[in-house]
UniProtKB/Swiss-Prot annotation:
Family affiliation: Belongs to the zinc-containing alcohol dehydrogenase family.
Function per UniProt: Trans-enoyl reductase; part of the gene cluster that mediates the biosynthesis of pyrrocidines, fungal natural products containing a macrocyclic para-cyclophane connected to a decahydrofluorene ring system that show potent antibiotic activities toward Gram-negative bacteria. Within the pathway, the PKS-NRPS pydA, with the help of the trans-enoyl reductase pydC, synthesize the polyketide-tyrosyl acyl thioester product which can be reductively off-loaded by the terminal reductase (R) domain in pydA.
Keyword terms, alphabetized: NADP, Nucleotide-binding, Oxidoreductase, Virulence
Residues given in the record as NADP(+) binding sites: C51, D52, Y53, K54, S180, P181, K182, N183, Y198, F245, E246, V336, S337
Gene responsible for this protein: pydC
Record-listed E.C. numbers: 1.-.-.-
Name the UniProt record assigns to this protein: Trans-enoyl reductase pydC
Amino acid sequence: MSPPALPSHHRAIVQANTDPVTFEISENRPVPVPLDDEILIKVSAVALNHCDYKMPGRVPCPGAVNGADYSGTVVRMGKKAELESGLRIGDHVAGAQVASSRRAPWAGAFAEYIRHHHSMVWKVPDGWSWEKAAAIGCATTSTVGMALWITLGLTGTPEEPAQEPEFVLVSGYRVVTTCSPKNFAMVESYGAEKAFDYHSSTCGEDIRAYTENRLQYVLDIITEARTIRQCYAAIGRGGGKYCGFELLPDDLLSTLRKSVKADWTMGLELTGNEVDLPGGYYRAANPEMHKWFVLWKQRYVALYDAGKLKPHPITVREGGLDKVIDGIETMRRREVSGEKIVYPLYNNSSKGVV
């Protein structure tokens, strides 16, 4: 397929030079040129993720492009990417960018065109909508898979029907979860055995009673003082493992049970590159993490295509990039619950399945 003509400039959402961090549209940015091992993607849809406001808030980088989850079409390829990726111009792909980066301020999904290393994207199966592909994004490509099978060290693999409460019902494991009561039916339909109200002051104790003091593994996607205490209260008398999604507060952990081994997961490590962030967020380069990701990526795409995994219910919002900033602010205000917000960037005449 002949490569399509490209504009010289495009639009992107970037961090504004404000405190606290806000976002703005950059109207006239040069279209990025892919390096030898990269592909250039024309973005068709983007999805919101909590990291879209959390990372800029922790590590401000004015002018850096924001956004993680996306889907789109390959429009240019570096020569190494042509040889190694198995992709071709015109293929439909999805992935999650490492955005709001001091080292790579051009990286970010909330743009009309993005460049991405070929190994970090996955080819979208036939028949998928742009919205579905974008909605899968960061949660499965990085943090959750890493949290379950690397940080928590679960045995077994997700071969059985595995649908999302905080990701999966894996083979041989019972899953309980927490959410708002309005979402109980949804998470139980996705595979959770039982859901508990995280607003309840006895949430942790209720889980511990339900699991008869035998709960061993806990994944905490919120990772605040309140949720950490709830998770520790839920783990059985014999102790277990706790995994958070944020840097853990040592002062709080020092007051909690020593029979629980606590750690946290940062999906940025799965690029294999150095994570050049300050303080406890720094990570040295780890190529083995990237090798694991490439294998995991192949597995989860197959599971999604077979219908054994699915994203949160998708809410499509119109307005393109101009409305994405409003969406980020709704997440920051915690007004989003039990849904994945997706914004199409294509025009209506091209709407349909991939």
